[in-house]
Amino acid sequence: MKYESIKKRIGSDKMKKIFFLLFMLILSISVSSKNLKYHPKTKEELQELIENESIYLGDIDTSAITDMSDLFIREKNKIDACGTTYEYITTKRTNFSGIGKWDTSNVTDMEGLFYKMKDFNEDISAWNTSKVENMISMFEDADSFNQSLNNWDVSKVKTMKNMFRGAISFNQPLNKWNVGEVMDMEEMFEAAYKFNQNINSWNVSKVKNMSYMFNSAKEFNQPLNNWNVSSVEDMTCMFRYTKKFNQALNSWNVSKVKYMEEMFFEAVSFNQSLNRWNVSNVKDMARMFCDAKKFNQDLSMWKVQGATDTVNMFLGSPLENRKPKWEGQ
C-alpha cells in the first residue's frame, strides 16, 4: 500500500509537470503574438501591410491567416499604356527579412505564394506547413530561391503541380518529405535546371499525374526505382529534355498509364531496360523515344494495342530503323 501511494504521488507529480509545461508553452505563444505590432485577420489585410515597405515583416502576427495564395501578387492581367498585357505583377517590396518568423500554422493554401518572385531567397525552413493542402506553383519562377525545406510537414498536401517549375537555382534535399497524400505532381520540377536530389524514398502511391514532372530538369539523375507509380495515368513528357537522366525504371508498375507521349523525348543519356513494363493500357506513345540518342533496348515483349498512337516513336534513336514488331501495329 505504501508503494502504491508513492507511485500515485509520482504519477501525479509528472502530470502536474506536463500540464505546467503545456500551460507555459501556450502562454509563451500567446504573449509572443501579443508582442507583435500588427495582427491582420485576412489575406487582404496582410497584403496591405506587405506593400508598406516601412513595416518589418517579422512584426506581423500571421497566426489568423489561412489563405496565403498569390500573396505577393499585386495585379493580374494588367494592360499598360502600350497595350502590353502582363499576366502577373508582383509586389514592389524588396526586403523580406523577418518572413521566416511568420506563424503559418493555420495556413491551408499556399498556391502561388512566391510565384515569379525573382529575387526572393529568405530562410523559411521553420515554417509550420502541417495544415497546407495546396502548394501549386508555390516557387514557380522563383529564380533565386535555394533554401532548406526538408523539415517541412507536407503530409496533408494534395497537389504539388508546378511547385518548383522554373525554380532555376533550387537544389535542396527533400528526402524527408511525406508526400503520401499528393495526387498531382505535374510539372513539379520542370525547368528546375539545378535540381538533383535523391527523392527515391517518396511515397507517390496516390499520384495520378506525373506529366512533365522532370521536363527540362537538366541536372537530374537520381534513382527512382523505389517509387510506387501504380496509380499514375499520365507520364506525358515526364523525362523530356533531361540531359543526364539514366536510371533504372524497369520495376515500375505502369499498368494504369494511358499517356506516354514524348516521355523520353531528347532524353539523350537514357538507355535502361524497360522490357518488364505492362503498357497494355497506353493510348499514346507518339515520339516517346524521339531523339533519345542512346536508347537501344529490346521492347519486343511489350503488348502494344493496335489503336495506340506510335507516330515517330523512335525517330532519331538507334531503334529508328529496327522498330519492335508488335501485334496489331
Regions found by a protein language model. Name each.
Residues M1-K14:
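Short, Lys/Arg-enriched N-terminal segments with co-localized hydrophobic residues
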Residues K16-L22:
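Sec-dependent signal peptide recognition
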Residues M24-V31:
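Hydrophobic h-region of N-terminal signal peptides that target proteins for export
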Residues V31-Q329:
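Negatively charged
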